[in-house]
Amino acid sequence: MAGLLGLKAAWPLVGAALLSATPALAQPAGSPAPAAEKPVSEQVDNPLADPASPPAGQPPTTQAPAPAPEPAAKAEPKVLIAEVVIEGLQDHPERERLELAAYAAMAATPGSRVTRTELQTDLSAIYASGWFSDVRIQPVDGPLGVRLVVVVVANPVLQQVKLDPADLKLPAQVVQDTFVADYGKTLNLNTLQTRMQELQRWYADQGYSLARITGPSRVSPEGVVELLVRQGTVEGVEVQFLNKEGSTTNDKGEPIRGKTKPWVVTREVSLRPGQVFNRRELEEDIKRIYGTGLFSDVKVTLKPVPAEPGKVVIVLGIVEQSSGSISGGLGYSQSQGVFGQIQLQDSNLFGRAWDLGTNISYGQYGGLGDITFTDPWIKDNKYRTSFRARVFFSREVPQLFQNENNSFTYELQNFDGADFDVVTSRTVNNNGTETVTTNFDTVAIQRIGANVQFVRPLNGGNPYKKAPWNLILSFGGQEVTPMDFSGSKYSYGVVGATSSPDVVPSNQVICLAFNCASENQLVSFRVGATYSTLNDPRNPTKGNFLSLGTEQFISVGENSPTFNRVRGSFTHYIPVEWLKLFKGCRPKPGETKDCKQALAFQVSAGSLVGSDIPPYEAFCLGGGNSVRGYYDCDLGVGKSFAEATIEYRFPIFSIISGEIFFDAGTTFGTQGDIPGNPGGLLGKKGEGYSPGIGLIVTTPVGPLRLEAATQDFTSDWRFNLGVGWKF
């Protein structure tokens, strides 16, 4: 007894003291909520005072002198640990594992000397192992030292993890896969935190960057763990207009007022109030906003909602760019000769993203003009349907009535009989000939008309879904008039006349329009579809593009024909890396590869169905967008056709690319099925092929093509200058 009293006097730390660490875990359902958790240091029972201090309530034996310097801090006393015992796990299925975890967490071992602070640290370490919901250390005096009895309460065996709220973006299978290795085992709070971080990473990987997982909010004795999930929701979307410097106010301190209607911007945003915020969706939304072509910069700010944690307002800072433009230039085409052109356009009419433009060109052989109105997305249409209306006027020399001419321009009058000339009068002779008079004017075709078109993506009513399929419906009407350059109407044309009057075979005199009329009225509707999986709409290297369409012409009078035009094309791109001339195709370590090259294939075909075919509606083969070794419409004029192209595109410098191509086309012998057989009379072959090479220069207005191609591997070469890729 004296030894025991002596030990107590030597270490007031122990005595009858009890040290405990009881984490405030959630209680079973229906239990009262626990009090706020105290620090571990405050969970130590009966912390004894310094033995040098008098007992509480007892006055000191001597009067304290005048204030004196504090004595040096005394070292904590240490006692000998005789034994460490873990209790509370007698019937636990993982007793051995948990006991080892508790022992491993403690620094105090039999034979060691420890202080009260060190013992408290051990208590905290046992709890920090994550296996226990309650930890208490009871020092018991013994003849050989202090016996430490560590009483623990193990966490329940994990059976299920629930998320609150239940309506989450996180799939149940992801939760199951995350915790499957832990089910049926004692819950470890450290492992639980690791699993929560895995779920947090899943949210981040899926773009839910505002989502937060906390808890556990409740751990039931049956092993059901509840975690709190705050996904982060959108409260609203606001549009804020900025100047070029990024300021919301002008020099006078007034708010910047934009031209664009706010709904033009917000309709491109898929994130709606109440929806879970997703960074990926917002990035796609920003791309769509840029894709309108109306804005030079878009700044995004997430504004937290006061008093509503987890809710944000998306603020879009918009910098508008000029929507009006005027441009002009000079050019050359076979149908117009040398021409001048002027274009006027406003791409944001009335701030509603409407596009209104006019194009006027006038050349040696005619001119054309049109006014086009486009609404890229009819307001409040969930299918993102677009609308376009066009009014046009043109007077051109159709190349189907022309033969090859290697000179820079055509003559307005043709005296050698190589092309069709207008017939001013004709007399039919009995011997299969006709006597014709002509002014040797080249045949011109004038068109005046209008059309409207609707395009609807097959997106299932989701305007933000990338739909590969699009449906096209259009209606149109036009009046077509064959004439000479003075504007006089003529119904017949002749080829081979070298004088006026002249006697020519009757088959060399043809009708220039349907029913040999001076005017034709064409009324039609067209149904079409497109399918695209291209990886880049401007310079694709991978994917497919399919276009199908049928246009039905309906008679509205004696000189109005009825027929149908069917046409389709298919394009396929295969990414390759054959030539590595461009340095981007040979990146150094750490550099990003930039080597856009592809092997491209295109097949197109079409046919006219019916007998009322106006000659000017025939299919033309040859030209910069057809078989490139031939001039426009110089290969064939047919009722049916097919073309095929194989092309290899590769970069050379940053803005210069090269191409090697092979084109081929045929009319399937249908030149004679066109009334008057203009292609046959002009000696057009009807089929041919063309290998060639080219350079493509990337410019602000698009790619410019400079190509050289030969006709059927002969010495006849043609040079072509075009805008944009052929396909």
Enumerate the predicted regions with their spans.
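Periplasmic polypeptide-binding modules associated with outer-membrane biogenesis and secretion
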Residues: 4, 27-334, 343, 357-377, ...
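Short glycine/proline-enriched loop/turn "hinge" motifs that connect secondary-structure elements
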Residues: 381-382, 537-541, 696
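C-terminal beta-signal and terminal closure region of outer-membrane beta-barrel proteins
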Residues: 673-727
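Gram-negative/organellar outer-membrane beta-barrel architecture
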Residues: 164, 168-177, 185, 190, ...
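C-terminal outer-membrane beta-barrel translocator/porin domains of Gram-negative envelope proteins
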Residues: 488-670, 675-677
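A generic structural motif
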Residues: 90, 473, 552-556, 710-712
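N-terminal signal peptide c-region/cleavage motif recognized by signal peptidases
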Residues: 21-23
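Bacterial N-terminal signal peptides that target proteins for export
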Residues: 1-12
